[in-house]
Amino acid sequence: MAIPYRRPQSTPEDGCAAYLDVIAGQGGVLLGALLLLDGRGRPLEFVHNRTEPPGGWMWPDELQFQACIAAVAHSLFDACRREPDLVVCKCTLGPRDYLRVEVGPSIPMVVVWPAADGAIQWDWVNDPPTHGMRSHSLAPELKTRGFLVEPFHRIVRGLQILYPTDLTKDETDDPVP
């Protein structure tokens, strides 16, 4: 016989945020990860991938990096089993226009970076969530609980464990934006 209990009301914790990061490793290798957390910071899924940039004299360095970021992001999106309500990324992945056009998630995406005073700033890459979307209340909840930057530390730790020969300490000294 089941024990009856009172179910909590729907809260922002019911939503899911996906933290996207791509880190340059040794020899030009790029390592990417997507960490999905609920509004309380509990991990739900971790998806990772690794790629080498296209080579040759026809590929300028900046185009190589941008092509790889989009390719890694898309492969992570395809491999993800859950459907997050929000994507959070660091400003190091590229300008907002690039992220909106080339990475192009159809769900709200926010980019984060540190301000001069140490506070974390954020800006919407595409349209911010509207009232009624779970991400509308999830995004402020993540900020209040301190989960705009901390998950990127988890991503780096995960990538270091999974790809120990591809990452050195120098490449992961400052894993936050």
Model regions and ranges:
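N-terminal nucleophile
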Residues: G28-L31, C89-R96, W113
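A glycine-rich, hydrophobic loop/mini-helix early in the fold
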Residues: V29-C80
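N-terminal accessory regions of nucleic-acid-interacting proteins
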Residues: M1-P4
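Ordered, amphipathic secondary-structure segments that act as subunit-interaction surfaces
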Residues: A67-L99
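Short Gly/Thr/Asp-enriched flexible loops that form oxyanion-binding sites at enzyme active sites
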Residues: G94-V111
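C-terminal folded domains that constitute the principal catalytic or ligand-binding module
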Residues: P114-P177
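Structural motif
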Residues: G15-A18, D85-V87, I107-V111
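Two-metal-ion RNase H-like nuclease active-site motif
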Residues: R6-Q26
